[in-house]
Amino acid sequence: MQKRGLQHFLKKEDLFGKINNMVNIKDILSNYKNIALVGASKDLNKTSTIVMKYLQNYGYKVYPVNPTIIGQVILGERVYGKVSEIDGPVDIVDVFRPSDEAIEIVNDAIKINVKVLWLQLNIKNSEAKKIAEANNIIYIEDKCTKIEIEKYLN
């Protein structure tokens, strides 16, 4: 049996600024299956595209978001300009953009009542975190969805 530490649990105080509840990344990835991937690229060698393909292969519905290639197709999915323009349900906003863009992204995501704002590895933004918390959006930063799936769902 594989020994796991508690690193897969994040205190909700880290996500919402509240105490006493735990948010389990495994539960998030198991229960939320609709993902807006912000920073999607047509370049198949880019990390965002590799992760998008992985998520699709794992059964997630992934909506690529990139305002420079609106209407084009990445891995069989039409590209949107903003999260709020997506015409299907979105649970998780997975961000592959610089930290300073996170505020604009979370403000847009609020419009469609997303459940999770997930900033990829090396992406952090304290103001985006505050905005997410104020709107009861689970905030995760500096973590890769692909890596977390490999840890907890395989």
Please tell me what each predicted stretch does:
Residues 45-46, 53-73:
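NAD(P)-binding Rossmann-fold cofactor-contacting core
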Residues 4, 8:
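Cationic, low-complexity basic patches in intrinsically disordered or flexible, solvent-exposed regions
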Residues 83-123:
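Mid-chain, well-packed structural core segment of small domains
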Residues 148-154:
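A charged, well-structured terminal subsegment
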Residues 121-148:
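Rossmann-fold NAD(P)-binding glycine/threonine-rich loop
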